[in-house]
């Protein structure tokens, strides 16, 4: 796979801001779009439990971790606390935590995403957290509880509407 499409919307409010398309417009859109798709991957669905909006022009790369926390409530509390405690590091970055409720990738129940400037930018962010937020990071790892790391990967945001 070379590209992913991600639709994000408020639960029970998935319509378009401009209003719904007519059926023929929707059919035309997907017909044209499908001409550019060689094969479709699997679809997944879940909920956003925590979200900080960011500038995807400044930080166009997202590092995504697929995880299974033993205690999702404790994980969310620890996640929200580290984002607040290290707000200088996370400023203008998309930072999110959510669930996989349908079609969990490799059994992962949750995901985390952090925006960055590419591979080197993400590594520098981790170094900054370790060097300058040691206590906050230690608290995060203690308070989040046991977490199974399933996989992680980086994606580039090419367009956002």
Which residues does each predicted region cover?
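Short S/T/G/P-rich N-terminal loop/turn motif that feeds into the first structured element of a domain
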Residues: 1-161
């Amino acid at each position: 796979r070379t590209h992913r499409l991600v639709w994000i919307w408020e639960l029970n409010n998935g319509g378009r801001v401009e209003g719904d398309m007519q059926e023929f417009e929707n059919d035309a859109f997907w017909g044209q779009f499908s001409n550019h798709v060689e094969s479709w991957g699997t679809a997944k669905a879940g909920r956003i439990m925590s979200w900080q909006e960011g500038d995807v022009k400044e930080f166009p790369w997202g590092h995504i971790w697929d995880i299974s926390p033993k205690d999702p409530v404790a994980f969310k509390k620890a996640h929200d606390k580290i984002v607040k405690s290290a707000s200088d590091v996370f400023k203008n970055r998309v930072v999110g935590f959510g669930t996989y409720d349908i079609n969990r990738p490799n059994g992962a129940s949750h995901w985390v995403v952090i925006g960055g400037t590419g591979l080197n930018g993400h590594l520098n962010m981790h170094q900054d957290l370790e060097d300058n937020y040691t206590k906050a990071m230690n608290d995060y790892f203690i308070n989040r509880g046991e977490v199974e790391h399933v996989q992680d990967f980086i994606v580039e945001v090419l367009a956002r509407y």
